[in-house]
Amino acid sequence: MPELPEVEVVRRGLERWVAHRTVADVEVLHPRAVRRHTAGGEDFAHRLKGRRVGVPSRRGKYLWLPLETTDTAVLAHLGMSGQLLVQPHDCADERHLRIRVRFADALGTELRFVDQRTFGGLSLHDTTPDGLPDVIAHIARDPLDPLFDDAAFHEALRRKRTTVKRALLDQSLISGVGNIYADEALWRARIHYERPTAGFTRPRTAELLGHVRDVMNAALAVGGTSFDSLYVNVNGESGYFDRSLDAYGREGLPCRRCATPMRRRPWMNRSSYFCPKCQRAPRVTV
């Protein structure tokens, strides 16, 4: 599932190719693609027609297109395989094309939502005074947000009394960090994923946040992480941060710091990758 860097890459592409364009027509080709829009596909298409798209926004892994002069926005759920592509009008339809948005201009391109597994979709929502779709107003700011409060995060982290990887994936504490980048940041910080958060000092929290930001910015610089053809940017191009991963997916390979074989452990229906030497497991107290 796309994490913050991948979603931000898509957002930047939409800002370049879709922002400030007026919708001429919307074609909903599969009902599941608008299942979160409870009024249905016809209502979704009708309410978008004639509206001007504002600058795309993002919080964590959530992406939306505000509609200018309204208090509404189109929220994009990419799911496991959703893609927002900007394609020429005459480009052949993708096999799993679900929604087509045509624009009232002569640029010759349209926005397409393509989704092989149909877990994703588009939906229209009212926005809060801060401009967020109301259904995601509870989501915490992400670490690349200029208004992210490091001190408040530290206090919340200690109060949560959980383990550090669970905290990094908790959208009420910090948004946008998924399994891949949590493992990468923890490896860089030399912290075991099961370390309790109650004992974190301010300097340790600051160091961890620094690594989270560094790994996300590094991924952004190369278009994100793509393990298959399902994650692409708006031009259909894959990212290649997977070539630079230090922890995730490297079970049995030597740690890039100490050469100890990396390990993988099942974790919350996912996997955690770590170095048993650099990232010592916390002591178990009885």
Swiss-Prot record:
It comes from the Bacteria. This is Formamidopyrimidine-DNA glycosylase. Keywords: DNA damage, DNA repair, DNA-binding, Glycosidase, Hydrolase, Lyase, Metal-binding, Multifunctional enzyme, Zinc, Zinc-finger. Involved in base excision repair of DNA damaged by oxidation or by mutagenic agents. Acts as a DNA glycosylase that recognizes and removes damaged bases. Has a preference for oxidized purines, such as 7,8-dihydro-8-oxoguanine (8-oxoG). Has AP (apurinic/apyrimidinic) lyase activity and introduces nicks in the DNA strand. Cleaves the DNA backbone by beta-delta elimination to generate a single-strand break at the site of the removed base with both 3'- and 5'-phosphates. The keyword Cytoplasm does not apply. Monomer. Its EC number is 3.2.2.23, 4.2.99.18. One of its GO terms (molecular function) is damaged DNA binding. It catalyses: Hydrolysis of DNA containing ring-opened 7-methylguanine residues, releasing 2,6-diamino-4-hydroxy-5-(N-methyl)formamidopyrimidine; 2'-deoxyribonucleotide-(2'-deoxyribose 5'-phosphate)-2'-deoxyribonucleotide-DNA = a 3'-end 2'-deoxyribonucleotide-(2,3-dehydro-2,3-deoxyribose 5'-phosphate)-DNA + a 5'-end 5'-phospho-2'-deoxyribonucleoside-DNA + H(+). GO terms for biological process: base-excision repair. The keyword Transport does not apply. Disulfide bonds: none annotated. The active site is at 2 (schiff-base intermediate with dna), 3 (proton donor), 61 (proton donor), 270 (proton donor). Belongs to the FPG family. Its cofactor is Zn(2+). NCBIfam families: fpg, PRK01103.1. DNA binds at residues 96, 117, 160. It comes from Streptomyces avermitilis (strain ATCC 31267 / DSM 46492 / JCM 5070 / NBRC 14893 / NCIMB 12804 / NRRL 8165 / MA-4680). CDD domains: EcFpg-like_N. Binds 1 zinc ion per subunit. SUPFAM superfamilies: Glucocorticoid receptor-like (DNA-binding domain) (SSF57716), N-terminal domain of MutM-like DNA repair proteins (SSF81624), S13-like H2TH domain (SSF46946). A zinc finger (FPG-type) spans 246-280. The lineage of its organism: Bacteria, Bacillati, Actinomycetota, Actinomycetes, Kitasatosporales.
